[in-house]
Structures are given as structure tokens and as C-alpha cells.
């Protein structure tokens, strides 16, 4: 089973980075105030929000946004046959529906490939497709962007502890980008995952590290 193989692989590789989430949460207000980084959630907050979902279609939609960085229009257009889950390194093929700059010769932008490394998400996808008998060319989430926004709003309204920032489906995309930066993902890789034509669009997310330079100042003698 691919999901089991991923679990074993993640356990065998020492790829965890120790991140102080409370400190980053404390810094977020200043980061959002003084930089161009769009509003984002930190990993523990994303987990809290996703765990609050009771409907499996909303749960999977949020997980898909979080794990792939897809725009909501791209996410709700995804059919099962865009996911390749029965391989050693699962991935999803996402058709970029928004791009800036001069279009490439030939017109339509080629789909981008985004790896899926989380075994539990792979299992969730497999289970959802099987349980709901979603045909390979049908959309996983046959809803509109407006409906997706409303479902997320209703979920947040029911939460006892509400997030401290305004959340839309696009927030998951920003949150993945910030999370990838915190975990040391190379910018060209992140650019590819997000489908940015111009890497300067990706560079914006590095500003989340603005307050992570304290240790460099400590080296200086005054």
C-alpha cells in the first residue's frame, strides 16, 4: 500500500525541523503589518481548523488546498484522474488557471505537478473516491467558489476558538507557502508548486522570516 510505504519512509528519514510555533504566532501580527506577506495560518492552526470539519467533502477540500497550494478554482476543478496515488511518490497534476506575464507559445499553460508526501492525506483521498464512487473524470468537489467560501465561513462560525485572521479558501495556499519557507523549501521548487510564472511572486513569502534574523544581530559586538 502506497500510504503505508510513505509512512515508513517518513519515519525512517530524519527530515523533521524543530519549529517554535508559539514564537511564530507571536510574531505574525508584526510580520503582516510590516511586510507584504498575505494573511496566513501556521501549521497548528491549520490542523485545528481541519479537525473541526465534520463533513468529509469539506474536510478533504481543505486538506487538498493545504497539501497542494491550489487556488480554490483549481481545487474544485480537480478530478480523481489528476491524482496519481498508486506510486511510490504520489502527486497531483494541477491545471494553472491564473498566470501573469506573457503566455507561452502554444497558448495554454502546462499543468504543474505537486508531490503528495502525507500518507494520511493519500488514504483520505483513496477512501473518499471509493466511498463516494467518484468517476475518474468527474470533479471531486462539484461546487462553486462561492459555495466553498460559504462552507468555510459556516465552519469557522461554529468553532469555539476562532482564528485571529480572516480566512478564505485562498488562505490555505498562502499558509502552505509560508509553511514551506519555514521548512527550508528552495524557492524554485515552491514557485513550481504554486504555479508562479514570476519568481518574485514567490519571493514575497520569504518576508515571513523578517523577524528570524535576531540570532544574526546577536553575533555583532556593540
Where do the PLM segments sit?
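Short, basic (Lys/Arg/His-rich) helix/loop patches that form interaction surfaces
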Residues: 134-138, 150-192
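Major-groove DNA-contacting interfaces characterized by cationic-aromatic clusters
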Residues: 27-32, 119-154
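Catalytic-site neighborhood detector that most strongly recognizes the C-terminal catalytic loop/helix
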Residues: 194, 198-219
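N-terminal DNA-binding recognition helix of tyrosine site-specific recombinases/integrases
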Residues: 1-27, 71-73
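Short alpha-helical segment immediately N-terminal to, or the first helix within
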Residues: 52, 64-65, 179-180, 193, ...
Amino acid at each position: 500500500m502506497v500510504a503505508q510505504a510513505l509512512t515508513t519512509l517518513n519515519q525512517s528519514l530524519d527530515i523533521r525541523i524543530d519549529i517554535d510555533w508559539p514564537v511564530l504566532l507571536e510574531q505574525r501580527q508584526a510580520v503582516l503589518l510590516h511586510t507584504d506577506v498575505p494573511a496566513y495560518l501556521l501549521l497548528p492552526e491549520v490542523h485545528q481548523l481541519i479537525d473541526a470539519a465534520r463533513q468529509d467533502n469539506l474536510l478533504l477540500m481543505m486538506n487538498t488546498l493545504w497539501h497542494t497550494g491550489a487556488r480554490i478554482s483549481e481545487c474544485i476543478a480537480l478530478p480523481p484522474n489528476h491524482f496519481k496515488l498508486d506510486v511510490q511518490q504520489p502527486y497531483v497534476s494541477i491545471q494553472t488557471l491564473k498566470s501573469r506575464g506573457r503566455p507561452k507559445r502554444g497558448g495554454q499553460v502546462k499543468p504543474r505537478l505537486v508531490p503528495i508526501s502525507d500518507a494520511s492525506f493519500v488514504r483520505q483521498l483513496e477512501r473518499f473516491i471509493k466511498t463516494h464512487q467518484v468517476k475518474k473524470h468527474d470533479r471531486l468537489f462539484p461546487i462553486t467558489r462561492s459555495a466553498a467560501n460559504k462552507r468555510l465561513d459556516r465552519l469557522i462560525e461554529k468553532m469555539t476558538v476562532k482564528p485571529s485572521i480572516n480566512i478564505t479558501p485562498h488562505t490555505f495556499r498562502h499558509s502552505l507557502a509560508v509553511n514551506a519557507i519555514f521548512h527550508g523549501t528552495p524557492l524554485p521548487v515552491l514557485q513550481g508548486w504554486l504555479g508562479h510564472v514570476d519568481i518574485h511572486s514567490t519571493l514575497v513569502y520569504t518576508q515571513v522570516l523578517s523577524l528570524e534574523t535576531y540570532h544574526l544581530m546577536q553575533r555583532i559586538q556593540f
